[in-house]
């Protein structure tokens, strides 16, 4: 889906939540640290969810 093409977005808050995003350049789901707010749809709690939605 189109959310898989959105850029990684950490957000403006200072939390530290381990998440995954789909890297459209590599075609893989990659871990990153999410700040807790102001993110976008390319933000998954699990690797499985990222792979299932983005077909990685």
From Swiss-Prot:
Membrane-spanning segments: none
Alphabetic keyword roster: Disulfide bond, Ion channel impairing toxin, Nematocyst, Protease inhibitor, Secreted, Serine protease inhibitor, Toxin
GO CC term (a single one): nematocyst
Site (Reactive bond for trypsin): residue numbering on this chain: 14-15
MF terms in GO: ion channel regulator activity; serine-type endopeptidase inhibitor activity; toxin activity
PROSITE patterns: BPTI_KUNITZ_1 (PS00280), BPTI_KUNITZ_2 (PS50279)
UniProt-listed SMART domains: KU
Family membership: Belongs to the venom Kunitz-type family. Sea anemone type 2 potassium channel toxin subfamily.
The protein, known as: PI-stichotoxin-Hcr2n
């Amino acid at each position: 889906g189109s959310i898989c093409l959105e850029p990684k977005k950490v957000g403006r808050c200072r939390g530290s939540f381990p998440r995954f995003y789909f890297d459209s350049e590599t075609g893989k789901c990659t871990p990153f640290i999410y700040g807790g707010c102001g993110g976008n749809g390319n933000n998954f709690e699990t690797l499985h969810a990222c792979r299932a939605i983005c077909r990685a």
